[in-house]
Amino acid sequence: VFYGGDDLHVDSINVTGWKPLGRKFHVTKSDGSILQELDGIPAYDVYRKYLNIRNDENFFYHTLEFPLFYEHNDTTILRTPVASNADGSITMTSDIDIGSVVRISYGDPGTIIESIRHDSKKIAQFGPDLLHIFSCAARRTFWTDKEPTYEISPFQEIAPSCGFFSHGEFLRTSGNLNQHNVTLVIAAMREGERKEPIGTATLSNENSMLKVPLVSRLATFISVTSLELEEMNMKLEHVNEKLK
């Protein structure tokens, strides 16, 4: 579908809400969507060691909430494991370049809700005539006890909308076209001057969702201690350089 016009205005956002967990890994071997090694060891071994996930038919369902998180082309990218292979490699939803620095991530409801609150205000200020909403099917699975459109409904209250759940979302950032996963991508469009929103964006049961679960507190603890360990290692390297 191609849109054009002398007075057509477009704005776009992407919402993740997944937070990095634990230490960093370097992609040392990959081939397209096949992630072979992280820090020189089979990629599957990382998921087995840190999440105790078995290499069986349930691998996809157990890793769905723990995609890999990294920065690329000035934006955050998530990649979800699809299957584990006999050689210890992992088939991902899309490619990850060799040299990328990745971390395992987890979905934090509070962060997701805060992102939706912030970005829905941005979209409302744009004053769209129409919203195109594309959300990864993995996000639908994440909100297991909610309606499938739970995190989409606030945007639907701003302007008429259409879209679908997807297996990959595309968005151009800083001149680069990026493929996302586990991401909510919204394109807002209008002709002429901004319009007043048809309603106010709200999330049902928002307060109950903001209660911090145990896993979130543990993840914060791990992330902070990992950062402190990295800082200590950097200081030790600096001291060693001085002693040479």
Language model feature labels by segment:
Residues 1-159, 166-241:
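Small-residue-enriched flexible segments
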